[in-house]
């Protein structure tokens, strides 16, 4: 019997899973919240711009160096039976390191410099740089832009590199390598300085056939091409291939066999497709957490406006993987729950339930359209299909009779409407959606939300019984690289997570939600396209 380790680095915590390669059984698991969390608002007592979201890379290593030995000690598994390790990571989470692969923030002279720290995926400090890239690409009629949704996100790697070069050249000068944090973890485990085709292809303007888009970089900044060539370029390893084995030093430190094979990192949401078994084209998967990623597989490559990229073989060999997303979903629900009136909080405490359970109970008693509310779910900007991090959320239709559960339900509906915008975008560009999957802690716990999604999308929703699909997907990659399975299909079918429940659309509610969606779409187009300057001007005052 053999085992694989899946290491999942999420936004707020890291998880280590030991999984049976024959049947996907979770033998052991370890979860650790990052000690420094997400660094927002201030850094070491110094105020940060509102758009900043940073992390400390030492927290990531703490997850590995504590988690793996603890699991091995608790399970008594022979390390020689662990054939592979897979890693998934949020993206684009970018790290800047010196020539010893030490994060720049560990250098004492950069301790208070925010640009020496890891730039988390939701760091939006590079919007000006993203705009410059986009405008230059439009002027140059750059052919690649269509494969990135005809836009450039401040969340991607190249704008973040430009931001550091512009605002902290002293950090850039001493930086030896720039990479996705997932690639850095692979380096720490193996000693190999490589790049995953998944991270580069989706977030870094790199194509397998042509490499980086240096023709564009040259037009944007005189130094950008040189920075990418000397600090980003490295050998590429594709998903399904092996980077190598765990280094002797790390094997000794973690208690692993030096023969354990390591997979290249995969983006966390993408790993979920493997974990839930969505391996075919025409299937849309919603990976729902603090944000939501909407992933599609297709045999062909299409230029779909508003998506975040399309890369061949980034999840499943020979299939193009497409990514779109919403930047605030779980975060948005938590925001609304935190605004709950005192009497609601007190009632929940007295009944021994969470505030979310109380709000869901109350919201479920309301009928679609009953409150007269429509919300725009842009509290953290809009990733798809508008690709504008400067946009802000809105709530329309408030009256003196509006209750807090009405607001809560309106925001749940808004995230469903945002998902429908994305689904229609896929469908409008020759990508049929036949099945819809949902995974993550939110759909597992919130049946009402999935009912709303089924009725808004007018699709059956299949919810997977797993809060940790990314970790299982990473373990599947470890099993493939370690030789436990001959191919992707074999590994996925053996190790995937089971179905928890399915929700069918209700015809009567589908009809009501069509009308509400039309209202949402009109507001979306007005404030996202035609009158977007209104929100941008207000945001500029913050």
Swiss-Prot record:
GO MF assignments: ATP binding; D-ribulokinase activity; ribulokinase activity
One of the GO BP terms on file: L-arabinose catabolic process to xylulose 5-phosphate
Catalysed reactions, semicolon-separated: D-ribulose + ATP = D-ribulose 5-phosphate + ADP + H(+); L-ribulose + ATP = L-ribulose 5-phosphate + ADP + H(+)
UniProt keyword Nucleotide-binding, yes or no: yes
Keyword annotations: Arabinose catabolism, ATP-binding, Carbohydrate metabolism, Kinase, Nucleotide-binding, Transferase
E.C. no: 2.7.1.16
Listed InterPro entries: ATPase_NBD (IPR043129), Carb_kinase_FGGY (IPR000577), FGGY_C (IPR018485), FGGY_N (IPR018484), Ribulokinase (IPR005929)
Source taxon at top rank: Bacteria
Kinase keyword on record: yes
Family matches, as Pfam families: FGGY_C (PF02782), FGGY_N (PF00370)
Pathway stated in the Swiss-Prot or TrEMBL entry: Carbohydrate degradation; L-arabinose degradation via L-ribulose; D-xylulose 5-phosphate from L-arabinose (bacterial route): step 2/3
Class of the enzyme per the UniProt entry, highest EC level: transferase
GO cellular component: cytoplasm
Recorded family membership: Belongs to the ribulokinase family.
HAMAP family in UniProt: Ribulokinase
PANTHER family in the cross-refs: FGGY CARBOHYDRATE KINASE DOMAIN-CONTAINING PROTEIN (PTHR43435:SF4), RIBULOKINASE (PTHR43435)
Listed name of the protein: Ribulokinase 2
């Amino acid at each position: 019997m053999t085992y694989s380790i899946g290491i999942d680095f999420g936004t707020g915590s890291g998880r280590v899973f030991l999984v049976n390669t024959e049947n996907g059984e979770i033998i052991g698991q370890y979860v650790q919240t990052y000690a420094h969390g997400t660094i927002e608002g201030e850094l070491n007592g110094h105020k940060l711009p509102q758009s900043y979201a940073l992390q400390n890379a030492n927290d990531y290593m703490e997850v590995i160096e504590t988690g793996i030995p603890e699991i091995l000690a608790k399970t008594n598994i022979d390390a020689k039976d662990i054939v592979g390790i897979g890693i998934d990571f949020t993206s684009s989470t970018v790290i800047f390191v010196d020539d010893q692969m030490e994060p720049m923030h560990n250098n004492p002279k950069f301790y208070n410099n925010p640009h020496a720290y890891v730039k988390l995926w939701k760091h939006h400090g590079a919007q000006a740089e993203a705009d410059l890239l986009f405008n230059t690409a439009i002027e140059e009629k750059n052919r690649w832009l269509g494969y990135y949704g005809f836009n450039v996100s401040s969340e991607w790697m190249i704008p973040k590199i430009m931001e550091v070069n512009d605002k902290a050249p002293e950090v850039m000068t001493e930086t030896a390598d720039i990479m996705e944090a997932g690639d850095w973890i692979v380096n720490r485990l193996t000693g190999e300085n490589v790049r995953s085709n998944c991270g580069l292809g989706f977030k870094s303007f790199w194509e397998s056939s042509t490499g980086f888009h240096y023709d564009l970089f040259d037009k944007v900044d005189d130094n950008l091409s040189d920075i990418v060539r000397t600090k980003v370029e490295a050998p590429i390893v594709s998903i399904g291939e092996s980077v190598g084995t765990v280094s002797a030093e790390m094997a000794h430190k973690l208690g692993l066999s030096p023969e354990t094979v390591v997979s290249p990192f995969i983006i966390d949401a993408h790993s979920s497709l493997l974990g839930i078994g969505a391996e075919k084209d025409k299937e849309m998967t919603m990976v729902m957490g603090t944000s939501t990623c909407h992933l599609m597989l297709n045999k062909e490559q299409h230029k779909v406006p508003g998506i975040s990229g399309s890369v061949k073989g980034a999840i499943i060999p020979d299939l193009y993987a497409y990514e779109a997303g919403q930047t605030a979903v779980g975060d948005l629900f938590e925001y609304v729950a935190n605004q709950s009136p005192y009497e609601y909080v007190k009632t929940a405490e007295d009944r021994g339930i969470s505030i979310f359970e109380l709000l869901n109970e109350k919201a479920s008693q309301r009928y679609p359209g009953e409150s007269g509310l429509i919300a725009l779910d842009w509290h953290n900007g809009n990733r798809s299909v508008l690709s504008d991090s400067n946009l802000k959320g809105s709530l329309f239709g408030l009256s003196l009779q509006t209750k807090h559960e009405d607001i809560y339900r309106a925001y749940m509906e808004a995230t469903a409407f945002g998902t429908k915008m994305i689904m229609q975008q896929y469908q409008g560009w020759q990508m049929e959606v036949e099945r819809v999957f949902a995974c993550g802690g939110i759909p597992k716990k919130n049946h009402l939300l999935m009912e709303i999604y089924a009725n808004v999308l007018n699709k059956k929703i299949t919810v997977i019984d797993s809060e940790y699909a990314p970790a299982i997907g990473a373990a599947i990659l470890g099993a493939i690289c370690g030789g436990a399975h001959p191919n992707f299909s074999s590994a996925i079918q053996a190790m995937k997570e089971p179905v928890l429940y399915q929700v069918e659309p209700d015809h009567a509610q589908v009809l009501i939600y069509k009308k509400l969606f039309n209202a949402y779409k009109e507001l979306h187009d007005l404030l996202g396209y035609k009158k977007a300057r209104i929100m941008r001007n207000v945001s500029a005052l913050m």
